[in-house]
């Protein structure tokens, strides 16, 4: 079992922490704010625009510079994967104009509650109000 620190409690950090913990690692997520996922509330005007339902190939047409840089990321965990994961957390989704994907409830707070429950279920330790001031590489790993 590895000891893993995730710095930043946005949606990406929350999912990274949960996935690492789900693989049997001891995971601590550090978030400087009073709660995780704070910026999720402003996506889609508070409705939580999760992703776009268009084919992955089509997404590259909308990336103005160096789309090849994102190939491995977008093919490694696709928009369909994120939709399936969120639905597995009990959040029903809908696709609107422009292939934009939202929770049926139109509330970002529902997605945030599900993400927090997902992390908790995987055993992630969350430290709020915890700003990481420095990071130092040592032989055994890192010191935060």
Question: What do these predicted ranges mean?
Answer:
Residues 1-2, 23-25, 36, 122, ...:
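Short coil/turn connectors at secondary-structure junctions
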Residues 2-29:
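N-terminal Rossmann-like FAD-binding beta1-loop-alpha1 element of flavoenzymes
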Residues 4-7, 27, 111, 123-124, ...:
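Hydrophobic aliphatic residue packing
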Residues 16-17, 39, 137:
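Short glycine-/acidic-enriched loop or helix-start segments at secondary-structure transitions
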Residues 29-32, 134-136:
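Short linear motifs in intrinsically disordered
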Residues 32-125, 130:
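Conserved N-terminal/central alpha/beta ligand/cofactor-binding core
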Residues 128-141:
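A conserved short coil-to-beta-strand element within the FAD-binding core of flavoproteins
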